[in-house]
Each structure stands twice: as structure tokens, then as C-alpha cells.
């Protein structure tokens, strides 16, 4: 794209607990996807005059992880460290997208049931630190639904830090029926570290956790019938796969491949008393008006990286069919690009002509202050 064309194009930034997805409205995929990490040196610099920075963001932090302490400013989908978050946004605009934020409207995303103070602080930072001309905060799950071409349905959005079931009717999330589950990709990575340790492999540091995350993404899957899969794994080696560690050591992983994501259906695996995602989906539907349940059952949309496991859609279909009334038509929609569907939905929304009057402008912000966000974004 030429510079003239990018003048005033809205920026879309989906801040996840694990990955930041950022790019330009109207694009079909984010230009920049990088880990939501800020790393700081563990030791005082040895290499004098090497121009060591006091902090690194994203991929650079990832590549220097051996000498850094890595921190995630977003926990369970909610921003907990604002100074680090500001560093991440700065990095997004200036290093990744290479734009001046004061020239573009910015669409940010937030977790459902985000505390009010949080969206006010986001709004304040955008206008006061980055001087944006206009901004908007949209709920992640709603954007995923738009990306699937629907305005009614129930979204299971599961990322790195948090999972939600969000029923949406004609474009509006129904807050009383939203289910939040503090169980997501990061917990699955930790659980995989634990069960691999039981097998005799040791993974402890933040750097090693990233290796385990890679094993999880490449080799894990959801079993259709967990008990049966366990029996198969016990009696044969057909489910075993090997993985080469960065130092050349090869490890073998068997039933861990499906025991790890099974936690989404059986949170008791990691000592959580919560219901699994199939039950939270059902409970969320049951909290909705009886007249719209049929539409929700027929439009179960999966979104987020933790829904990327092979086999998850079939398993959800099976589990929800078992819970729902026997005559109910149940459909699970798992778009192939669901890892980025929140961002894609944001890209669609920000480029709609009807959306242009929805932006919070700098002028409105100056008149009303941060609380304007509650009146304009819902």
C-alpha cells in the first residue's frame, strides 16, 4: 500500500494475553503478530558499551530470553501492568506497523467483563500518551462472531490467558449470560510442563516454557473419547510422537498429547473446581432467553488459539449434543483462521462506513474525559 492510501486508515490492535495481533483495517490478516512479553536483563551488562537496553519487547525479548526475565503485562485477558503495556503499544505502532499513532484512529479489543477502570485507562493512554485522533474499544468475542459472518451465535473464545463463552444476539453481547473460565493456553502449557516432568524431562525456566508451548502447538490434540484414547495409548505406541529440543535431544511424547488439552473439558486435571468448556457453553445458553437458544445452539463459533487443537470441534459437538435437548440442531463452527478471528472482525468493523460515527474522537475525549468510553463502546 502507498503512504497516501494509508493516511487515516484505522489501526486494529488485538491485545491478547499471549500474542499481540496488529495491522490495518481492511486487511484480511494482521501485519504484526508477536508475543505480549516485556523482558528485562537478569544481570548487569557484561558487554560494556554494547548498548544494552533496559527492556525488550515481543520477538526480540523472545530471542534473548536466555538472559532476560520475561513478564506478560496481560493476565487472564486483563491488563495488569500499564507501564509494560505502554511499551508494547509503543513497539506495535513504531517498530512493527511503523506508523504515527497521531495520524490514525485506533480500534482496541478487550476481554468480556473487563473492569470499567481498565477501559478508561486504555482510553486515557491512547489519547494522552499516543495522541490518537480517535479510538474505540470492542469486545473480543463479538469481533470473532462478525468475522464468521454472523450477528447471532455463541462464541467460545479461548486464548492464552482466559476463556469465555459469550452469547450474542443481533450484534449485542448478553452480559448476564457470559461465562468466564480462567483456564486457557498458558495453563495448558504449564500442565504439559508438569506431566512431561513426570516422564523425566525437566522444564523449569521461562525460556523452557516457550519450548513446551511449541510442543503443545505442534503435537497436542483433543481426543473424541478420552478413556478409549488412554487405553489405546497404554496398549500400543501408535500415538507416540517425537520432538527435537533446541539442543538436539529428542523427547518422546505419548498420552500427554491429548491429556494436556483434555483439561479444557476436565479442569479437575489441574485442580480447578470449574466446569469444562462444554458445560460452560451449555450453562451460558441456558442463561439466555428460551426463544433465542435454538439460534445459539446452531451457531457455536470457536475462536482463539486454544481452539486450534485438532479434534476439538468434533468433541464439542459430541459433548453439547449430550447436554442439549435431543431434537436440537447443534452446529460447531471452527473457521480455519480462528486464531486471528478477533483481529479479522476488528478489521471488518473498523472499515464499515456505518461504523465511522462510532469512533470516540479526541474532541469528545477532551470534553468528557475517559468515562466517555462507557457511553460509546458497548
Curated annotation (Swiss-Prot):
- Per the record's keyword annotation, is Hydrolase included, yes or no? yes
| Subcellular localization(s) per the UniProt record | Cytoplasm, Cytoskeleton
Which reactions fall under this protein's catalytic activity? ATP + H2O = ADP + phosphate + H(+)
Main location per the UniProt record: cytoplasm
One Gene Ontology cellular component term attached to this UniProt record is: cytoskeleton
MF annotations from Gene Ontology: ATP binding; hydrolase activity
* One Pfam family per UniProt: Actin
Recite the UniProt keywords alphabetically. ATP-binding, Cytoplasm, Cytoskeleton, Hydrolase, Muscle protein, Nucleotide-binding
Gene3D superfamilies noted in UniProt: 3.30.420.40, Actin, Chain A, domain 4 (3.90.640.10)
Q: What is its EC number?
A: 3.6.4.-
What family does the entry list? Belongs to the actin family.
Q: What does this protein do?
A: Actins are highly conserved proteins that are involved in various types of cell motility and are ubiquitously expressed in all eukaryotic cells. Multiple isoforms are involved in various cellular functions such as cytoskeleton structure, cell mobility, chromosome movement and muscle contraction.
State what protein this is by name. Answer: Actin, muscle-type
The species is Molgula oculata (Sea squirt)
State the organism's lineage: Eukaryota, Metazoa, Chordata, Tunicata, Ascidiacea
